Amino acid sequence: MNPNQKLFALSGVAIALSVMNLLIGISNVGLNVSLHLKEKGTKQEENLTCTTITQNNTTVVENTYVNNTTIITKEPDLKAPSYLLLNKSLCSVEGWVVIAKDNAIRFGESEQIIVTREPYVSCDPSGCKMYALHQGTTIRNKHSNGTIHDRTAFRGLISTPLGTPPTVSNSDFICVGWSSTSCHDGVGRMTICIQGNNDNATATVYYNRRLTTTIKPWARNILRTQESECVCHNGTCAVVMTDGSASSQAYTKVMYFHKGLVIKEEPLKGSAKHIEECSCYGHNQKITCVCRDNWQGANRPIIEIDMNTLEHTSRYVCTGILTDTSRPGDKPSGDCSNPITGSPSAPGVKGFGFLNGDNTWLGRTISPRSRSGFEMLKIPNAGTDPNSRIAERQEIVDNNNWSGYSGSFIDYWDDDNECYNPCFYVELIRGRPEEAKYVWWTSNSLIALCGSPFPVGSGSFPDGAQIQYFS
């Protein structure tokens, strides 16, 4: 066979193989299409587990690639969402451990970190996030000048992964406003933001990110809400809102919502004289809120809400161990019904406590005059016994470092616990007014802690940024 004949013979064989592979490819495509149509036409059974079948056929024909892929995916078995029921009591706590620290100001020296204040933590069935009111700027941006002001048109609520400093890329915008609260009922999240003028603000209410209603002011003097998470039971969420003077008589309401709509509202009942910035937690089909009396009391007022009757009452934490800032010295005996006066300077700061009988813990700044340091005090029966005293103390932030607002939160969807493990956060404020020598801005980082059923060691967890680096 001469060379030309050999060439023709080899070419013929190659063409035959190519045609054969092409026919195989076409048959594979036809088979895959028929299987896919059969799959779509077959009624899916319930409670299917996630199954993925991947078939790859690759044929090489003289550097030509033909790929056939079949992917059959079945939906996972997802548990239907249900309303949260507050059927558990609080867990017993022997000490507190840090679960998150975002170091936002330290990162902000070189990264584009958003200026925030009034942060808090709130959880849902998928986990916990940090929420905070941003100032419409980053720390290194010139617009950060003047962010000491609480109420501007540039503020809004954002959420970020817990323990991660807020940046433009990782922050999820939620609503416009300068006061907020947010909570999940097990099915959806309700959020309230307050915006507008001091004398005519508007509360906007969202459920699953859709605007559901608005609320007008009733005293036309800085309508405001909790600055930490609200709490829900069986589809009803309770929120404490105040309108009126910060230094004299104000007008507080306990409002009840279902899917973002008001179903009931009550004017404040009980003996509390002034209510602001409540930190609330749920237990035993009830909600307990530990609040701020910005008018008279260095002892904290509390609101107790029965979520079965949607009724509430108010009074004061009974112990003489005072937990607002500023405050006079601790008293040998407290008062369950009346404010304890005598604060030496600024009238108050947002705070919290867990009133759990013998396992009651209260948080406060270490300094009685300024927002510096932070400590947790175990005071058995502080909520009911005027003569209760400190049994244990745990330092969270040493008194050489700034603190700020603090509040409670609970992961109600932690199914590994037969009780609700109490948690709290501390805002670590930096910048103005305390550090006006170095910077023009005011912002914060955050630490979050949860209870441990076992004894813990010691440690201080300050913000840690060297403020002079920002000069």
UniProtKB/Swiss-Prot annotation:
Give the primary localization class.
Answer: virion
Q: What is known of its domains?
A: Intact N-terminus is essential for virion morphogenesis. Possesses two apical sorting signals, one in the ectodomain, which is likely to be a glycan, and the other in the transmembrane domain. The transmembrane domain also plays a role in lipid raft association.
Q: For this protein, what is the EC number?
A: 3.2.1.18
Q: What is this protein called?
A: Neuraminidase
Q: Name one GO molecular function term.
A: exo-alpha-sialidase activity
Glycosylation site positions? N32, N47, N56, N57, N67, N68, N87, N145, N200, N234, N401
Q: Locate the region Head of neuraminidase.
A: 90-471
Instruction: Please name one Pfam family that this protein belongs to.
Output: Neur
Region entry Hypervariable stalk region, spans: 36-87
The way its activity is modulated is described as: Inhibited by the neuraminidase inhibitors zanamivir (Relenza) and oseltamivir (Tamiflu). These drugs interfere with the release of progeny virus from infected cells and are effective against all influenza strains. Resistance to neuraminidase inhibitors is quite rare.
Indicate the residues that form the catalytic site. D150, Y405
